[in-house]
Amino acid sequence: MAGVGAAFRRLGALSGAGALGLASYGAHGAQFPDAYGKELFDKANKHHFLHSLALLGVPSCRKPVWAGLLLASGTTLFCTSFYYQALSGDTSIQTLGPVGGSLLILGWLALAF
């Protein structure tokens, strides 16, 4: 299991780097369709950072595979739906947000137990 934990730690670090890159893009280069788009982007970025940090803790939990998969997939679905809507104004994939959020909750529970 040490290899699995190390893989999720690496994924968390890469995700954090990606979150920082997106934060820079959102602050300096992005063209948002409206003020709500900027707010949505910032919300996605905050969650992206937070859950990247959570992935760094996966190797320390009792069920690293479950916790890592739930956190990684939840972060992807939740943040991607927000980033996409923020940048495009298209709401067609916003239903992925609650699915991703539910996976994130389960991921945090997997970290705890």
Swiss-Prot record:
Membrane-topology annotation of the record: Multi-pass membrane protein
Keyword Ligase: no
Modified residues (N6-acetyllysine): K43
Bilayer-spanning residue ranges: 64-84, 93-113
Subcellular location: Membrane
Pfam family, one: DUF423
Signal peptide limits: 1-29
Membrane topology (Cytoplasmic): 85-92
Domain of life where this protein originates: Eukaryota
InterPro entries reported for this sequence: DUF423
Keywords from the named record: Acetylation, Membrane, Signal, Transmembrane, Transmembrane helix
Assigned protein family: Belongs to the TMEM256 family.
Name the record gives this protein: Transmembrane protein 256
Organism: Mus musculus (Mouse)
Encoding gene per record: Tmem256
